[in-house]
Amino acid sequence: MAEDIETKVVKAKKASIELSSVSEEVKNRALEAMAESLDRERKAILEANSKDLEYASELKKVGKLTQALVDRLKVTDSKIDGMIAGIMDVIKLKDPVGETLSTLELDNDLILYQISCPIGLIGVIFESRPDVVPQVMSLCLKSGNATIFKGGSEARESNRTIFEILVKAIESTEGMPKGAFQLMETREEIMSLLSLDAYVDLLIPRGSNEFVKFIQDNTKIPVLGHTSGICHIYVDEFADPDTAWKVCFDAKVQYPAVCNAIETLLVNRKIAEAFLPKMAEMYIKAGVELRCDKDSYILLAEKGLSPLSKATEEDWSLEYNDLILSIKLVDTIKEAIAHINTFGSHHTDGIITENASRRKEFIGLVDSSSVMVNASTRFADGYRYGKGAEVGISTNKIHSRGPVGMEGLLIYKYILMGKGQVVADYAGENAKPYTHRKLDLKFADVN
């Protein structure tokens, strides 16, 4: 088994070299073929997904799968439309490979170029969501990266069907290398993949807190991702109530099973009585379980609102991924910021305010990869950020942070163009000086 896995990885690694230099025209043709194949093979995809949903239903009954994961697993015609739209958006994006990032003259006829290039071979390990396959494959293809996919067993039929449809489309496109995209399906294969740091350049895990943490703790391969999505909205005393009601409702209810839905609502005490009862009523009508701190519980109970639960200290650190929301009253914006930076996951947090200085303070001090002002946290998404699609959301403080699109799948190399220069001429008593002059030159224009 392990030898078979290594064979797949070595094959993908070799193909990654060829893929890195495929032209934009060929890559776009392959992407078009992917989109057309998804549209043509809808029936096969939905049939495979129905098998997974039956299996997932059994897992849920015995407590091995949450409703949130079941929701993410479901594929519909509209979700297939979304997969296709995401691929078409990637086609519209400019080829990011070979872009000149900077040009520096070291001396006459000694020019240093910094250009973008693919990372190489990326491993993507994910739970439940079959739409990850076309999202990530399209971005990796356009950015010239070979990819190993490993999905959860609960989505095995969907993942395999979608993967095979897409790979057939890619490999039937003239000029595309074969073997650049591989699929792994067993838990044992994950452990083998995690040990192949000699071949795999980056891992992108997508799933629960425990899942991502497990990946991080069991590999030497660099990992890009986030362990949880504990997101907040702070309703400031200078908030417009209508804006706050609308935004806070969307941020929890529109799709609670995802990592950019809020888990805690922080409300300034000065606006609480005017804002919170109506907000709570909206949530309760939508089926949201409210877990309130002492003061918000008293306020809402006195208004006759129910059902209400009392929040525990543990609730501030929980990612529910469900119709559950913690509520806390705060005295100041500083208290709200301190709470977010203490209990949040540095994913996405927002403020509702009409006060410019409060807005500036929140943006400057909240340590999150995305900060929303008078807008729903649900906008924190690669597609909505105009990236075509996303490979994931990173809370790491590395080269990629927030929703990661193609730019997060690129690194750079330096190319020095000279005419016989040697370091000896720039060292010693009669050393020539470096000019270190920035130039507006593109490497693509070099003859």
Swiss-Prot record:
Catalysed reactions, semicolon-separated: L-glutamate 5-semialdehyde + phosphate + NADP(+) = L-glutamyl 5-phosphate + NADPH + H(+)
GO BP term, example: L-proline biosynthetic process
Presence of keyword Amino-acid biosynthesis: yes
Annotated localization: Cytoplasm
This protein's GO CC annotations: cytoplasm
Main location: cytoplasm
UniProt family annotation: Belongs to the gamma-glutamyl phosphate reductase family.
Protein name: Gamma-glutamyl phosphate reductase
